[in-house]
């Protein structure tokens, strides 16, 4: 990297999953709008055609007159080629296909177990982790060999398991996980504050929060705007609007069809006194099944949705068609801020600015005092030149710890199961997951695990002997 007049050039970013038809385009547009950084993006993907298409799309963006951040995009034929000389590594992959995810999400429904997302917790999240961990073992070993000093940014779910695997394989890695769910909750607070305080256009970044939890089961125990404590305002809003909830307009591609009225957040606040800081669809999967996911009628009553894999397949088809239009020049990507912070964090790690944002990293410094040091936790951190300094978030209330610990323990079980090919550990994790617990007999759980492993065996190591 070269520095001159407050700018940095010759930055190399390796993008693992560089054929992405969602996050990659968001990444490209944010880079194109940042005038103080430039360099090379090396795109690696097992689908080389998809990576090649993104190379074309990225370079078309670079050639545009309205692009201020100039980057050269190239396709790498191997992970080694992409990683060699990289200053930053971005990981954004789909572990398996939506056919495997169809089994993840819908196979447990035969036992009355419903999942609103199926990529983090619950049977679907754990099965996805078993596919993902071997991939991340390979990626971590490659980073260790070819770019050990690079900063590694993960966007892949299940976030906690991905980051945990990177550190398990390469303890000295400089890796962290980025997730936008906290931003979404800040936007809810922004909207409520604008209504209740009669203020126009509050900037989300002016909503200051203390973040603590694990990914997709994250909480605020502090929220303020220009010295105003937002907790009493949030509490009063819930008292007045619990039944109708809060609706917002969200143009982010990743959230557009995931709308909810945030009534699950409101319900959790009434019980625990903290602001739950993730989408309702994610939050529900960390709670006992009967509370929010008992059946489709209960889901409808709480005003969120079950994201079906059929919808995901249709969405992928739409994005494939969009990719063809972008490559041909029939359509052009709009250059507008995505609301994501990945590029801002890279800019901070380059030393051009200083940023506080939420991050998923090991709890090594006990930034959440009463969670294990081996857990991957989500808290705020300070990003500056070649450094991430986690902010001490304090203690999590014990009643929230009790909800969180089964998932942290399951991370340990699933990690060990993935590395030792131990089916009994998968069964153990399923049995204590709150979506599964009390919903099935041991024999039914064992059969479910057997069938789900069989459905995903194409992406599992042969040592599973399936």
Swiss-Prot record:
Residues engaged in binding NAD(+): 11-78
Reaction catalysed by this enzyme: [(1->4)-alpha-D-galacturonosyl](n) + H2O = alpha-D-galacturonate + [(1->4)-alpha-D-galacturonosyl](n-1)
Cofactor(s) listed in the protein's UniProt record: NAD(+); Mn(2+)
Binding positions for substrate per the UniProt entry: 157
Free-text cofactor note: Binds 1 Mn(2+) ion per subunit.
Keywords: Carbohydrate metabolism, Glycosidase, Hydrolase, Manganese, Metal-binding, NAD
Enzyme Commission code(s) on record: 3.2.1.67
Gene3D superfamilies for the chain: AglA-like glucosidase
Entry-linked InterPro entries: GH4_Enzyme_sf, Glyco_hydro_4, Glyco_hydro_4_C, Lactate_DH/Glyco_Ohase_4_C, NAD(P)-bd_dom_sf
PANTHER family reported for this sequence: 6-PHOSPHO-BETA-GLUCOSIDASE-RELATED, ALPHA-GALACTURONIDASE
Function noted in UniProt: Alpha-galacturonidase able to catalyze the hydrolysis of the chromogenic substrate p-nitrophenyl-alpha-D-galacturonic acid (pNPalphaGalUA). It is probable that alpha-1,4-di-galacturonate (GalUA(2)) is the naturally occurring substrate.
Family affiliation: Belongs to the glycosyl hydrolase 4 family.
Protein name, entry field: Alpha-galacturonidase
Source organism of the structure: Lachnoclostridium phytofermentans (strain ATCC 700394 / DSM 18823 / ISDg)
